[in-house]
């Protein structure tokens, strides 16, 4: 059976302000992949995704930043992620989680968060990234760390402290594609 990927998640998956050219667009040149990203999506909403999972062999998930921007605590987010993993496992999907970039303080200048809350959001994201590593090891699924995207300065290529510009989106697509090919 040919690998068929489903990309689920937030605005990073959708391609906020990139006219559909998120990392998924660049992956689609080499992979059979569907994009189901949605701006503003959080993990507690993603677990209610009821799209058809049957045609897919793999699911690529990027989620979590909005949860922390909306004030959710790690325990709440982790519970939702475990529920998601259980859903994907029950559908026999190979799971790939993308560890999100730790947002830049510049996000506060664009009103994504307040300067008062930024340190807490950053701390929660750091803890969440560690949680994903542990969960991936325990459940034998792939983790791709977007902070490791090669050949580009990540923070110089965020439009607003959170969202990749076109250059970073393309680099992320290339990096993720390289990691996916290592699996084959």
Where are these regions (language model features)?
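A structural signal for the hydrophobic beta-strands that form the central parallel beta-sheet
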Residues: 7-8, 97, 143
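Short aromatic-enriched loop/helix-cap "lid" or pocket-rim segments at secondary-structure transitions
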Residues: 19-20, 48, 107-111, 154-157
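Histidine-centered active-site loop/cap adjacent to the catalytic His
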Residues: 46, 157-184
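Residue-level recognition of beta-strand->loop/alpha-helix junctions
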Residues: 35-37, 99, 145-147
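Substrate-gating cap/lid alpha-helix
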Residues: 107-146
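A short helix->loop->beta-strand "cap" motif at the edges of active sites that frequently abuts
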Residues: 90-95, 141
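Conserved SGNH/GDSL esterase-like catalytic core that processes O-acyl groups on lipids
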Residues: 2-7, 12-87, 124
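Alpha/beta-hydrolase-fold catalytic nucleophile elbow
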Residues: 62, 98-99
